[in-house]
């Protein structure tokens, strides 16, 4: 199965759907779904996902290179792995999504969206994770969902972690730093993301990794993400990565800006970078007689997008943690 990406983009079903690799077995589970199981017993399970948004291609290319290294035998596998290319149709079309944003649908939220390929795919992915994590004796569960951002950022690589009732494990956060993430953002409320679903329902240590800016296939400079790729290779092989000399800055979400109607106005232009700082009292958005202002001494914006559909998030406001 050394042509997983090509098969996914073409929508083709392989003639052979399972086989042997270098020290592992593989099974094609469906379009964009590939399970890898080491020959030796392991108690660690890892979801590696990318392409939830079809225009975010750099992580997909990164996973393709990791798979090639595994199949060639130059990389040893020490985890059970489920590789997920989230939205095959949008990936093939080179667009963010075909009908609706899938990363708002998980945890059963797809039921509140108009039925589409994305709602069906979200349900399929939920079932796939359930099956994967239910198989075998699993002591450690991780989920790394690889993305790129729509706009530029003051932090080239950063992670977004879902709301979690338990403390985050230190080795997981340390690995994220070793993977080159310059900042970590901690959600304080539940959401419809893929990583929140895996964390809430399966207790996985989950993170959305944002790696640079969204570009078409073939236009990505993967050398920007070599530290992340090297950390993923080490993780798969069971090799401990060295701790980053500069731990990631930490932020938490303090509010969400939501667009409710066509009267919504977000006072940030297309050049506003992720993690841009705003002083207390700054007017961020208006909608009718409702005004959204900065309430802390300094807040930082993440994912500003005035063009989202009504009812969806138009941005997150963050505060720095000590």
Swiss-Prot record:
Catalytic reaction list: N-succinyl-L-glutamate + H2O = L-glutamate + succinate
UniProt-annotated binding residues for Zn(2+): 53, 56, 147
Cofactor note: Binds 1 zinc ion per subunit.
Listed GO MF terms: hydrolase activity, acting on ester bonds; succinylglutamate desuccinylase activity; zinc ion binding
EC number: 3.5.1.96
Record-annotated active site: 210
UniProt cross-references to Pfam families, sorted A to Z: AstE_AspA_cat, AstE_AspA_hybrid
GO biological process: arginine catabolic process to glutamate; arginine catabolic process to succinate
Cofactor(s) required for function per UniProt: Zn(2+)
UniProt key word Plastid: no
Pathway named in the protein's UniProt entry: Amino-acid degradation; L-arginine degradation via AST pathway; L-glutamate and succinate from L-arginine: step 5/5
Its job: Transforms N(2)-succinylglutamate into succinate and glutamate.
Family: Belongs to the AspA/AstE family. Succinylglutamate desuccinylase subfamily.
Protein's name according to its UniProt entry: Succinylglutamate desuccinylase
Native organism: Salmonella choleraesuis (strain SC-B67)
Lineage: Bacteria, Pseudomonadati, Pseudomonadota, Gammaproteobacteria, Enterobacterales
